[in-house]
């Protein structure tokens, strides 16, 4: 039996980050986590591009454009969606999730879901580098691993 796995060596790879500006004070912490993960695993700063979009809903379009460019081993999508008093949260979360998954499947480039979806702001803060780790860091790690796995197939 042959086991296929990706490693966490990011050297000589280029990655893109797409970040939603809405709730920027949280998203900036996710970006910091992603940059930390990339740096720790050999990705040079000049091999990371960051694209800002207005909010989470706009992320899939730019992720698709970046993935189709052929320049990147992976694209990390970062944003925060916090439940409010209306059903807006449900629509945004559902469409962003589907959009990101479709981009990855359509382009065969790892497009990683790093969108923090929470019931309240406290939960979002916890997932941006406090009690619950940093989901940006986790997303960057997944991008490196998936990029290497695809190379091994």
From Swiss-Prot:
A GO-annotated cellular component: cytosol
Q: Where does (2S)-2-hydroxy-3-oxobutyl phosphate bind?
A: 85-86, 127
Q: In which pathway does it act?
A: Cofactor biosynthesis; riboflavin biosynthesis; riboflavin from 2-hydroxy-3-oxobutyl phosphate and 5-amino-6-(D-ribitylamino)uracil: step 1/2
For this UniProt record, give its keywords in alphabetical order, as a comma-separated list: Riboflavin biosynthesis, Transferase
Catalytic residues, per the record, are 88
Q: Carries keyword ATP-binding?
A: no
What GO biological process, any one, is recorded here? Answer: riboflavin biosynthetic process
Q: Which CDD domains match?
A: Lumazine_synthase-I (cd09209)
Query: Transferase among the record's keywords?
Result: yes
Q: Which InterPro entries match?
A: LS, LS/RS, LS/RS_sf
Q: What is its EC number?
A: 2.5.1.78
Alphabetized GO MF terms: 6,7-dimethyl-8-ribityllumazine synthase activity
Cross-referenced Pfam families, in alphabetical order? DMRL_synthase
The UniProt catalytic activity note for this protein reads: (2S)-2-hydroxy-3-oxobutyl phosphate + 5-amino-6-(D-ribitylamino)uracil = 6,7-dimethyl-8-(1-D-ribityl)lumazine + phosphate + 2 H2O + H(+)
Q: Report residues binding 5-amino-6-(D-ribitylamino)uracil.
A: 22, 56-58, 80-82, 113
Which PANTHER family does the annotation name?
6,7-DIMETHYL-8-RIBITYLLUMAZINE SYNTHASE, 6,7-DIMETHYL-8-RIBITYLLUMAZINE SYNTHASE DMRL SYNTHASE LUMAZINE SYNTHASE
Protein family: Belongs to the DMRL synthase family.
Q: What does this protein do?
A: Catalyzes the formation of 6,7-dimethyl-8-ribityllumazine by condensation of 5-amino-6-(D-ribitylamino)uracil with 3,4-dihydroxy-2-butanone 4-phosphate. This is the penultimate step in the biosynthesis of riboflavin.
Name of this chain's protein: 6,7-dimethyl-8-ribityllumazine synthase
Organism listed in the record:
Clostridium perfringens (strain 13 / Type A)
Q: Which gene encodes it?
A: ribH
